[in-house]
Design a protein with these regions (language model features):
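Repetitive helical segments and hydrophobic/amphipathic motifs
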Residues: 11-12
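Bacterial N-terminal signal peptides that target proteins for export
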Residues: 1-7
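Cross-family detector of peptidyl-prolyl cis-trans isomerase
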Residues: 20-212
Length: 212
């Protein structure tokens, strides 16, 4: 219980620095969110490429150039650090996917949540993912997900599903295997419940592994 209270205090504290007054219009909050994303991109030297260029590069981003592709339908910026080992999720298939992640408040550029630190390294966020006619849906296992524990929701942020058409889901079976690894900048509309409510953009560093 103390861990949960401590965790919620950290998350709420991070969100508080970007909370808007009741007098703020939603449009103003959206503009603030876009401005914070642009500042984050400049600060971190991110090279934004178009979807057309991304496709020409074989649906890959050049990490050495710090490339992120802007996916227009979602507004999510994505960098594929590693495509991963194994196979992509097939149409009609449902799979358990295990995730390690860092969640960063874009406006404050501060870490909000992570299951990679010592306090929470015993929790690997588990989600059940289904692909149907090219569309991905997913839900967290509330008994084994820090995101679900923190935000009181089994809903997986839409932004987390954006990389799934481009990555392989597998398990490490040899020294040369690598998990799928992506970095995302997720606008509030594609984010978790608090981010959506507070009109808060978040950045994520996530690895994806196929569960058993």
């Amino acid at each position: 219980m103390k861990k949960i209270i401590f965790l919620l205090a950290i998350v709420l504290g991070a969100i508080a620095i970007t909370s808007c007054s009741d007098n703020d219009s939603y449009d103003k909050q959206l503009k603030r969110g876009r401005k914070s994303i642009n500042k984050f991109i400049v600060k971190h030297g991110i090279n934004v490429i178009s979807e057309a260029q991304f496709e020409k590069q074989g649906n890959k981003t050049d990490v050495s150039k710090n490339q992120y592709v802007l996916l227009n339908n979602s507004g999510v910026y994505m960098q594929i650090v590693n495509e991963g080992t194994g196979e992509k999720l097939k149409n009609g298939e449902t799979a358990t996917v295990l995730c390690r992640f860092d969640e960063t408040n874009v406006q404050g550029d501060t870490l909000m949540l992570s299951n990679r630190n010592l306090r929470w390294d015993g929790i690997v966020d588990k989600m059940l993912v289904t692909r149907t006619s090219g569309t991905f849906t997913a839900s967290f296992d509330k008994s084994s997900s820090l995101m679900a524990l923190t935000y009181k929701s089994e809903s997986v942020p839409k932004g987390w599903l954006v990389p799934l058409p481009y990555i392989k889901l597998g398990r490490i079976t040899s020294a040369t295997d690598q998990l799928a690894h992506v970095r995302l900048i997720v606008p509030s509309a594609q984010g978790q419940s608090f981010a959506s409510k507070e009109v808060l953009a978040c950045a994520y560093d996530i690895t994806f592994q196929r569960g058993v």
